[in-house]
């Protein structure tokens, strides 16, 4: 946005304070519905940060994905969950829980050591087509698409694996 400097700074201060107050609301409010609404407020403020930095596509994705889908899903899950079922019963860990946490922790540490020990400099993942480079890309969406399949292919694939694991975990929890 082409805002003058002082107005831009004032908006940044208001959005930053909104994020801090909203995140405190997420942590400190005892009612989970109010905490979910505070989370929605924080996500909207983050989206407005993206608008201030001229990243309109990321702001729209933030609103659609996080506020529109994830936060609504959290609110519905909290509303349909029985409160007494989880508040009084604290079950003791079983052997399966210990084995699962041990396996997950070992996979996590092996991934961290692999990432830290790999020399990432000089790795060429893909090459860009000359036709794509010669074209004058018209929109930010095309630029994002080109970067996702060339420069950021490894993080893109890692995020897809994390989302797949989260989906499998959600299905496993829903079946119980």
UniProtKB/Swiss-Prot annotation:
The UniProt record lists the keyword GTP-binding: no
Signal peptide: none
Gene Ontology molecular functions: NADH dehydrogenase (ubiquinone) activity; quinone binding
Predominant place of localization: plastid
Entry keyword annotation includes Transmembrane: yes
Enzyme class, first EC level, given as a word: translocase
Keyword list, A-Z: Chloroplast, Membrane, NAD, NADP, Plastid, Plastoquinone, Quinone, Thylakoid, Translocase, Transmembrane, Transmembrane helix, Transport
Membrane topology: Multi-pass membrane protein
Superkingdom as given in the UniProt entry: Eukaryota
GO cellular component term, pick one: chloroplast thylakoid membrane
Pfam families in alphabetical order: Oxidored_q3
Residue ranges crossing the lipid bilayer per the database entry: 10-30, 32-52, 61-81, 92-112, 152-172
Functional description taken from the UniProt entry: NDH shuttles electrons from NAD(P)H:plastoquinone, via FMN and iron-sulfur (Fe-S) centers, to quinones in the photosynthetic chain and possibly in a chloroplast respiratory chain. The immediate electron acceptor for the enzyme in this species is believed to be plastoquinone. Couples the redox reaction to proton translocation, and thus conserves the redox energy in a proton gradient.
Assembly description: NDH is composed of at least 16 different subunits, 5 of which are encoded in the nucleus.
Entry protein name: NAD(P)H-quinone oxidoreductase subunit 6, chloroplastic
């Amino acid at each position: 946005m082409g805002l003058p400097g002082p107005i831009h700074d004032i908006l940044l201060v208001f959005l930053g304070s909104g994020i801090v107050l909203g995140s405190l609301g997420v942590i400190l409010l005892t009612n989970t519905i109010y905490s979910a609404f505070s989370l929605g407020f924080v996500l909207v403020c983050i989206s407005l940060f993206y608008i201030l930095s001229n990243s309109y596509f990321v702001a729209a994705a933030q609103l659609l994905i996080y506020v529109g889908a994830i936060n609504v899903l959290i609110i519905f899950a909290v509303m349909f969950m029985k409160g007494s079922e989880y508040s009084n019963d604290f079950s003791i860990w079983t052997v399966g829980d210990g084995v699962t946490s041990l396996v997950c922790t070992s996979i996590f540490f092996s991934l961290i050591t692999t990432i830290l020990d790999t020399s990432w400099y000089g790795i060429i993942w893909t090459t860009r087509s000359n036709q794509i480079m010669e074209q004058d890309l018209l929109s930010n969406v095309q630029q994002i698409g080109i970067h996702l399949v060339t420069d950021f292919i490894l993080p893109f694939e890692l995020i897809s694996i994390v989302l797949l694991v989260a989906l499998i975990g959600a299905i496993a929890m829903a079946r119980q």
